[in-house]
Amino acid sequence: MLAQAPRAVEAIALPAPSPWGSLVIDTGRCTMCLACVGACPEAALADNPDKPQLRFTEKNCVQCGLCAGTCPEQAITLQPRLWLADGGKARKQMRVLNEAEPYRCIRCNAPFGTLRAIETMVGRLAGHAMFQGKAAERLKMCGDCRVIDIHTDPDEVKVTDL
Protein backbone atom coordinates (compact mmCIF):
# COMPACT_ATOMS: atom_id res chain seq x y z
CA MET A 1 0.00 0.00 0.00
CA LEU A 2 2.87 2.38 0.77
CA ALA A 3 4.35 1.75 -2.66
CA GLN A 4 1.07 2.84 -4.29
CA ALA A 5 0.79 6.12 -2.36
CA PRO A 6 1.13 9.28 -4.51
CA ARG A 7 3.81 10.65 -2.16
CA ALA A 8 5.90 9.28 0.68
CA VAL A 9 4.60 10.03 4.15
CA GLU A 10 6.89 9.59 7.14
CA ALA A 11 4.15 9.45 9.78
CA ILE A 12 0.39 9.68 10.10
CA ALA A 13 -0.88 11.39 13.25
CA LEU A 14 -3.62 9.39 14.95
CA PRO A 15 -6.27 10.42 17.46
CA ALA A 16 -5.97 9.27 21.06
CA PRO A 17 -6.57 6.62 22.16
CA SER A 18 -4.72 4.72 19.49
CA PRO A 19 -3.03 1.32 19.59
CA TRP A 20 0.04 2.67 17.76
CA GLY A 21 2.44 5.43 18.51
CA SER A 22 5.61 6.77 19.97
CA LEU A 23 6.70 8.47 23.16
CA VAL A 24 8.15 11.91 23.63
CA ILE A 25 10.63 12.16 26.49
CA ASP A 26 11.29 15.52 28.12
CA THR A 27 15.03 14.97 28.58
CA GLY A 28 15.22 18.03 30.80
CA ARG A 29 12.96 16.33 33.35
CA CYS A 30 13.88 12.65 32.91
CA THR A 31 16.34 11.40 35.54
CA MET A 32 16.70 7.99 33.88
CA CYS A 33 15.23 6.18 36.89
CA LEU A 34 13.82 3.65 34.39
CA ALA A 35 10.55 3.17 36.29
CA CYS A 36 8.88 3.31 32.87
CA VAL A 37 10.83 0.27 31.69
CA GLY A 38 9.45 -1.83 34.54
CA ALA A 39 5.93 -0.57 33.90
CA CYS A 40 5.82 -1.35 30.17
CA PRO A 41 3.83 -4.55 29.63
CA GLU A 42 4.86 -4.91 25.98
CA ALA A 43 8.64 -4.43 26.30
CA ALA A 44 8.49 -1.34 24.10
CA LEU A 45 10.81 0.37 26.59
CA ALA A 46 14.14 -1.16 27.55
CA ASP A 47 17.29 -0.16 29.34
CA ASN A 48 20.84 -0.81 28.18
CA PRO A 49 22.81 -3.02 30.57
CA ASP A 50 26.07 -1.43 29.43
CA LYS A 51 25.26 2.27 29.86
CA PRO A 52 22.41 4.51 31.06
CA GLN A 53 20.04 4.58 28.10
CA LEU A 54 16.28 4.50 27.65
CA ARG A 55 15.56 2.56 24.45
CA PHE A 56 12.27 2.22 22.59
CA THR A 57 10.81 -0.08 19.93
CA GLU A 58 7.77 1.63 18.46
CA LYS A 59 6.15 -1.50 16.99
CA ASN A 60 5.78 -2.88 20.54
CA CYS A 61 4.09 0.22 21.99
CA VAL A 62 0.32 -0.08 22.46
CA GLN A 63 -0.05 3.46 23.89
CA CYS A 64 -1.43 2.12 27.20
CA GLY A 65 0.10 5.03 29.13
CA LEU A 66 1.47 2.96 32.02
CA CYS A 67 4.93 4.40 31.41
CA ALA A 68 3.65 7.99 31.60
CA GLY A 69 1.60 7.23 34.71
CA THR A 70 4.58 5.61 36.44
CA CYS A 71 7.11 8.35 35.61
CA PRO A 72 7.87 10.27 38.84
CA GLU A 73 9.18 13.22 36.83
CA GLN A 74 6.18 13.41 34.48
CA ALA A 75 8.62 13.38 31.58
CA ILE A 76 6.71 11.06 29.19
CA THR A 77 4.05 12.08 26.68
CA LEU A 78 2.24 9.62 24.42
CA GLN A 79 2.36 10.44 20.71
CA PRO A 80 -0.30 8.46 18.81
CA ARG A 81 0.86 7.93 15.24
CA LEU A 82 1.64 5.40 12.58
CA TRP A 83 5.31 5.76 11.72
CA LEU A 84 5.95 4.78 8.12
CA ALA A 85 9.60 5.81 7.73
CA ASP A 86 11.69 3.39 5.71
CA GLY A 87 8.56 1.63 4.50
CA GLY A 88 7.49 0.92 8.08
CA LYS A 89 10.75 -0.87 8.93
CA ALA A 90 11.90 1.93 11.25
CA ARG A 91 9.08 1.05 13.69
CA LYS A 92 10.78 -2.30 14.30
CA GLN A 93 14.17 -0.83 15.16
CA MET A 94 15.11 -0.06 18.75
CA ARG A 95 16.14 3.57 19.15
CA VAL A 96 17.52 5.61 22.04
CA LEU A 97 15.05 8.11 23.51
CA ASN A 98 17.34 9.36 26.27
CA GLU A 99 20.77 8.68 27.68
CA ALA A 100 22.69 10.04 30.60
CA GLU A 101 26.08 10.23 32.20
CA PRO A 102 26.57 7.43 34.72
CA TYR A 103 27.19 8.33 38.36
CA ARG A 104 30.21 6.76 40.04
CA CYS A 105 30.31 5.59 43.64
CA ILE A 106 32.33 7.98 45.81
CA ARG A 107 33.93 5.02 47.60
CA CYS A 108 34.78 2.43 44.91
CA ASN A 109 34.18 4.41 41.69
CA ALA A 110 31.80 1.76 40.28
CA PRO A 111 29.09 3.16 38.00
CA PHE A 112 25.55 3.08 39.39
CA GLY A 113 22.53 5.17 38.53
CA THR A 114 22.87 8.42 36.65
CA LEU A 115 24.36 11.74 37.65
CA ARG A 116 20.99 13.46 37.32
CA ALA A 117 19.12 10.79 39.34
CA ILE A 118 21.60 10.90 42.22
CA GLU A 119 21.66 14.72 42.24
CA THR A 120 17.84 14.78 42.26
CA MET A 121 17.65 12.25 45.11
CA VAL A 122 20.27 14.09 47.20
CA GLY A 123 18.45 17.38 46.61
CA ARG A 124 15.06 15.98 47.61
CA LEU A 125 16.42 14.38 50.78
CA ALA A 126 18.68 17.29 51.81
CA GLY A 127 16.27 18.55 54.47
CA HIS A 128 15.32 15.12 55.82
CA ALA A 129 16.62 14.38 59.32
CA MET A 130 17.64 10.81 58.40
CA PHE A 131 19.90 11.96 55.56
CA GLN A 132 22.34 14.35 57.19
CA GLY A 133 26.13 14.09 57.48
CA LYS A 134 27.46 10.59 56.79
CA ALA A 135 24.00 9.33 55.86
CA ALA A 136 23.79 11.95 53.11
CA GLU A 137 27.17 10.83 51.77
CA ARG A 138 25.95 7.21 51.64
CA LEU A 139 23.39 8.26 49.04
CA LYS A 140 26.37 8.78 46.75
CA MET A 141 27.60 5.20 47.26
CA CYS A 142 26.68 2.03 45.40
CA GLY A 143 24.61 -0.54 47.30
CA ASP A 144 27.62 -2.62 48.33
CA CYS A 145 29.65 0.32 49.63
CA ARG A 146 26.62 1.70 51.48
CA VAL A 147 26.29 -1.53 53.48
CA ILE A 148 30.03 -1.75 54.15
CA ASP A 149 30.10 1.88 55.30
CA ILE A 150 27.21 1.41 57.74
CA HIS A 151 28.76 -1.72 59.29
CA THR A 152 32.28 -0.30 59.60
CA ASP A 153 31.30 3.11 60.99
CA PRO A 154 31.86 3.12 64.78
CA ASP A 155 29.52 6.11 65.15
CA GLU A 156 26.60 4.39 63.43
CA VAL A 157 23.60 3.77 65.65
CA LYS A 158 23.34 0.09 66.52
CA VAL A 159 20.18 -1.79 67.41
CA THR A 160 20.51 -3.24 70.90
CA ASP A 161 18.33 -4.98 73.43
CA LEU A 162 16.49 -2.59 75.69
Indicate residue ranges for each PLM-predicted region.
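Catalytic cores of glycan-processing enzymes that make or break glycosidic bonds
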Residues: A129-F131
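C-terminal accessory/interaction regions of large nucleic acid-associated machines
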Residues: L139, V157-L162
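Ferredoxin-type iron-sulfur electron-transfer modules and their immediate structural context
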Residues: M1-Q53, N60, T70, Q74-A126, ...
